[in-house]
Curated annotation (Swiss-Prot):
Membrane disposition: Multi-pass membrane protein
GO BP: any one term: regulation of pH
Keyword Transmembrane: yes
Keyword Coiled coil attached: no
Organism the protein comes from: Rickettsia bellii (strain RML369-C)
Protein name per the record: Putative Na(+)/H(+) antiporter NhaA homolog
CC annotations in GO: plasma membrane
Keywords: Cell inner membrane, Cell membrane, Membrane, Transmembrane, Transmembrane helix
Length: 132
């Protein structure tokens, strides 16, 4: 835990000195993640802490290297990491998984309920915002 605190101070110093190289933040970020996970703290908190210290504006200029990194990893995060994170934290047990359970009427009822509910909600919002 103390090591994590020291690494957070290093992140603060990097931000204070307006260091804009991605390599420094990547190395320190990985070290912070490893130290926090080893201390028993969830890795998601590490990502939030790192995001607080990454400089976006340096002396009035937008740091394009961080925006390039964001655009580079955004599809990977949106289509792989985030769904995997949600699935793993949803509490679904894979030991009871079978094709029979996927094709059950309960599963189809849940899927249809979510799909139709989303469509009805969107249409209701559209109707409520329409000028009369």
């Amino acid at each position: 835990m103390f090591i994590s605190f020291v690494i957070i101070i290093i992140l603060f110093i990097l931000n204070y000195k307006q260091v804009k190289h991605l390599l420094y933040y990547t190395i320190v970020g990985v070290l912070l993640w490893v130290s926090m996970v080893e201390a028993g703290i969830h890795g998601t908190l590490c990502g939030a802490i790192i995001a607080l210290f990454i400089p976006v504006n340096i002396k009035g200029q937008i740091n394009s290297s961080f925006h390039k990194l964001e655009k580079l990893i955004q599809p990977f995060v949106n289509y792989f990491i985030l769904p995997l994170f949600v699935f793993m934290n949803s509490g679904v047990l894979l030991k009871d998984f079978s094709f029979r359970s996927v094709c059950s009427s309960l599963t189809f009822g849940i899927i249809l309920g979510l799909f139709i509910g989303k469509q009805l909600r969107s249409y209701a919002i559209f109707l409520s915002m329409r000028e009369v």
